[in-house]
């Protein structure tokens, strides 16, 4: 395979994972990333694999669907999971990372790989056939390339994601904030908590509703992903919605009083040293002046908050994957092009990396002249593939982005004791099914990790 060069466009989680999987199988890769020549509105760091929303890759517990996906990716030698483990910061049972060190680690691994050539330029045209290419340009695909992709697929849609603010640690009032992880998970100081009584909470919700928001372009109708809703959009759904959502106080009793607040704002550390903390669930489209005003005035403990980063919104572009893509993630109308990551309609960092891995394996199968061998459907990777092909959805389904969830898995057979029993059955079945699929992988220089448990 060494004489064949594959182009990977996009240096995010999907693109870097695809490039890594191809390179470790002996394929020469040209990884094209538009930074620093051009940056999207949401990108700040100079390196690859920049995390622009949260610094959390979510639950690392395999009894959670995304935690099971973590496990499967580790077993398959994932670059993203390997670097995440190396740069992990305490976050209870979640896999959170120091985002700068994580980006640096991914960048270094690919820069040092002899089979990878990184090119920094913006592409405005899709690569022509017959050479194979992986398009992993993500939710912030530049306009020119997005237009070319729309012409090719006829399937472009977009909605908006929103980014949460980050606060400098020294500006948080520790006489008000208290350290505690929900239900006592983790080391106990993975999160800081800002308690709100009922009056404070209601005043905050009213401020969110009245605050000035960034307007969308007149020709674009915002379509938010339910898993990343702006906090003010949730507030619009009802007075107590936030108190039952990201500000839920359950399991976060104030150790100084022994009482549960009416609502709690959680802050999760951004780095190992805890110099910066992000406001969990506070994705927002409030204007920057309004964010400073509202969060300082209405959130206890943030009266003197210094914001390392303020929230913002950005467009998310994705194709109607079940109709646009073949089962091997190649574009039906242009089979030399493979899509990976959020542009396919997967949602989440880990799902994007997993999609990059799947696209790379599909390319390897194409190069070897064999049919694509999809992951077993009962695995987390297989469930994600079922989402992309539409197999997990009813006929006529209005395709929307999705995280990996057990609802995407094939139904279980037999009887299982409660929700926990069903999760355990899903995990046991997935582990059994993944092993033989791993054995079909092309030879690599990096051994796969053993199964957990």
From Swiss-Prot:
Positions of the UniProt region annotated as Disordered: 433-453
Biased segments, Low complexity type: 440-453
Catalysed reaction equations from the record: uridine(54) in tRNA + (6R)-5,10-methylene-5,6,7,8-tetrahydrofolate + NADH + H(+) = 5-methyluridine(54) in tRNA + (6S)-5,6,7,8-tetrahydrofolate + NAD(+); uridine(54) in tRNA + (6R)-5,10-methylene-5,6,7,8-tetrahydrofolate + NADPH + H(+) = 5-methyluridine(54) in tRNA + (6S)-5,6,7,8-tetrahydrofolate + NADP(+)
Keywords: Cytoplasm, FAD, Flavoprotein, Methyltransferase, NAD, NADP, Transferase, tRNA processing
Co-factor(s): FAD
Assigned GO CC terms: cytosol
Binding annotation for FAD: 10-15
Top-tier EC class: transferase
Gene Ontology MF term list: flavin adenine dinucleotide binding; tRNA (uracil(54)-C5)-methyltransferase activity, 5,10-methylenetetrahydrofolate-dependent
Signal peptide (from-to): none
EC number: 2.1.1.74
NCBIfam families: gid_trmFO, PRK05335.1
PANTHER family xrefs: GLUCOSE INHIBITED DIVISION PROTEIN A (PTHR11806), METHYLENETETRAHYDROFOLATE--TRNA-(URACIL-5-)-METHYLTRANSFERASE TRMFO (PTHR11806:SF2)
The protein's name: Methylenetetrahydrofolate--tRNA-(uracil-5-)-methyltransferase TrmFO
Gene expressing this chain: trmFO
